[in-house]
Curated annotation (Swiss-Prot):
Oligomer status and interactors: Can form hexamers. Interacts with E2 protein; this interaction increases E1 DNA binding specificity. Interacts with host DNA polymerase subunit POLA2. Interacts with host single stranded DNA-binding protein RPA1. Interacts with host TOP1; this interaction stimulates the enzymatic activity of TOP1.
Gene for this chain: E1
Motif extent (Nuclear localization signal): 76-78
Name recorded for this polypeptide: Replication protein E1
A GO molecular-function annotation: ATP binding
Compositionally biased tracts (Polar residues): 590-603
4Fe-4S in keyword set: no
Family: Belongs to the papillomaviridae E1 protein family.
The species this protein was found in: Human papillomavirus type 8
Positions of the SF3 helicase domain: 405-555
Function description: ATP-dependent DNA 3'-5' helicase required for initiation of viral DNA replication. It forms a complex with the viral E2 protein. The E1-E2 complex binds to the replication origin which contains binding sites for both proteins. During the initial step, a dimer of E1 interacts with a dimer of protein E2 leading to a complex that binds the viral origin of replication with high specificity. Then, a second dimer of E1 displaces the E2 dimer in an ATP-dependent manner to form the E1 tetramer.
Amino acid sequence: MADHKGSTSKEGLSEWCILEAECSDVDNDFEQLFERDTDSDISDLLDNCDLDQGNSLELFHQQECEQSEEQLQKLKRKYLSPKAVAQLSPRLQSISLSPQQKSKRRLFAEQDSGVELTLNNEAEDVSHEVEVPAIDSRPEDEGGSGALDIDYTALLRSSNTKATLMAKFKEAFGDGFNELTRQFKSYKTCCNYWVVAAYAVHDVYESSKQLLQQHCDYIWVRSIAAITLYLLSFKAGKNRGTVHKLMTSMLNVQEQQILSEPPKLRHTAAALFWYKGGMGTGTFTYGSYPDWIAHQTILGHQSAEASTFDFSVMVQWAFDNNHFEEADIAYGYAKLAPEDANAVAWLAHNSQAKFVRECAAMVRFYKRGQMREMTMSEWIYTRINEVEGEGHWSSIVKFVRYQGINFITFLAALKDFLHSVPKRNCLLIYGPPNTGKSTFAMSLIQVLKGRVLSYVNSKSQFWLQPLGDCKIALLDDVTDPCWLYMDTFLRNGLDGHVVSLDCKYKAPMQIKFPPLLLTSNINLHEEANYRYLHSRVRGFEFPNPFPMKPDNTPEFELTDQSWKSFFARLWTQLELSDQEDEGEHGESQRAFQCSARSANEHL
């Protein structure tokens, strides 16, 4: 680089520093120097002109509006959410048991511009009627002649028809539709009670009151503005599809104009709504109150009775109806709940299963004691009196003769068998298969309520326990292992002596074997290995096949009615005692009572 005039080049670290400014020909022009503005960059810092008000008031007004809008939105979040008590009936909300869903609606508008804000505002405008409740502007009953007129086109404009209908319902009746009903998701679930809210049915409102009477036992109808509310108790259970079909044809409306759900049957507040509403001047009712409304709103002497459960009444019912199994007791007693106050109290108890188990145990104890107290004559007389219908004893006589047996001999053996004569209390029916041995024996055991033993359980030492709980027993299809067991262990029992019977969960019992009926394909008296049983078992052979009619029905009717006629006809020949002679001078015997109620208590 060329050296400049009047400057000295420096070496070393000071090379970067310019010691003298370079001259420029542009700065030599005097006119341009004087024309140039000599003010500094901060010369306009002070403004000495007159003051002007400007738009400060408008700015302040905008700020106040924004602050007020923000406070208003906070109040909306607090008081106008779906959880607000102001939207519900205060008395109903205080005892409501239904869960409230959280509000997912966004109350603060986004401070942004563009398409998304427009879409959000449009969505808020559509759901505005659902969000804001009507406080002071309720229309009058019966036809909507009040100051507020519900917009019929809102249902068409709304994207959520059900939500709009529920909003209209709440505006009209003051209570939410879901507060009065429970939800059925399936259209096929049947129910006798239905709550129906119909929109815009003024033309056929009066006629529906009369038309529904042929379908319902109870009708509750009230119309406010454009909403008509029905509580219907149908004579037969109906599903939602059937209810909609009936109401659309009767009211001439579309299905979109109807809300239908079953009522809450165990909700006191809902029951009070229907009860108090039925007493209003604008409500039409037909029929008596349903039971679920009457029980929750009408007080009576049944209320105090239903609060306590009497276990002895349950035991007495099971004893009188011969229910021994726990399942039969539970199901049968539950069906009595609508009519029996004690059954209602049992259903409301937390220990239902405990009571059922104890009831079954007590009934078995009572029945076992009753059976042991009876003689064989009393037992047969009691059992045949429980048989309904009539039969003919000749069917049994003809069948015995068909098998080639002398009926007089058979009758004598049956007499010793029923009286448990020693070494005559075991009767064997043997023969080839398909001769009716089991059918004949089972029919006798069934009518006398005997017990059946199965040798398949012989590995258990308790397989003979049913002999202690019956008046007659059957051991069907005895084979060689069973004959060997009887020859080894049961000789004393077949002799009619007292034996020790091992029972589960109990000490061994001292009993005599009841009459024991056997069926087998083996002729015991031809087997030399069992010669010690020959004198203890009386046998009859059934050699002929069991006859059948062309329609595949038995030729001989071995039914309960036939055995009933058989014992009644041959009562004297079997030497069964007269039941009048067994009483005290012919006096009537009082029925067994196991309940705690006094005999002189008023009904």
